């Protein structure tokens, strides 16, 4: 019966109930079929795990029961819950598959992990797919802009994790031409964090911004274009050869 259900609706393995349990977690907690024999329970587990791998590999898309960019931060989308479940279960193969395949197709899952302040999960994601740190959305926000949104739970430690991974996040601008610090100052940082935590975040952002400015000041000046053109002319580079002769 379990196999029949999952053949018709494979994504059900990732569906989360009101107790924040997916089918496998529910079975583990409540003993699967109490009337079923151990051998039968073992078969059920294998069937569920088979379909979990299908979801993790991207062969079966997760149908969200909630909007991914949630307005109420108490709600978490099913795709992120499933990712957290794979992490908690310690299934490295499925976790790696899910991160490699699904996060390329659905960047919002990574953003939501950051906004939900899932630090261990974010570190794991970045260890398997470092390119996630370079993601930007349609508004030009990088992951640091997103971490500072007014509903985000990302604390100072999460901000530090992101900046340690890619310090240049601090100077990248969105389509409003705002760096993350400017974005936070304009829109008020997160309203779900304490003032003390926001002050910590501001201090970290300012430190990284100061370091970025200091680093830029030590870089050599760009070459003078006119001087480069003059040198090229002397060397015959503008003609594609040596001493003005074509090759």
UniProtKB/Swiss-Prot annotation:
Q: Name where the ANK repeats lie.
A: 105-135, 139-171
**Does Repeat appear among the keywords?**
yes
User: Could you tell me the keywords of this UniProt record?
Assistant: ANK repeat, Repeat
> Which N-terminal residues, if any, form the signal peptide?
none
Query: In its keyword annotation, does this UniProt entry include Repeat?
Result: yes
Q: Fetch the InterPro entries from UniProt.
A: Ankyrin_rpt, Ankyrin_rpt-contain_sf
Matches recorded under SUPFAM superfamilies: Ankyrin repeat
Stretches of the chain forming a coiled coil according to its record? none
Name recorded for this polypeptide: Putative ankyrin repeat protein RBE_1110
Q: Which organism is it from?
A: Rickettsia bellii (strain RML369-C)
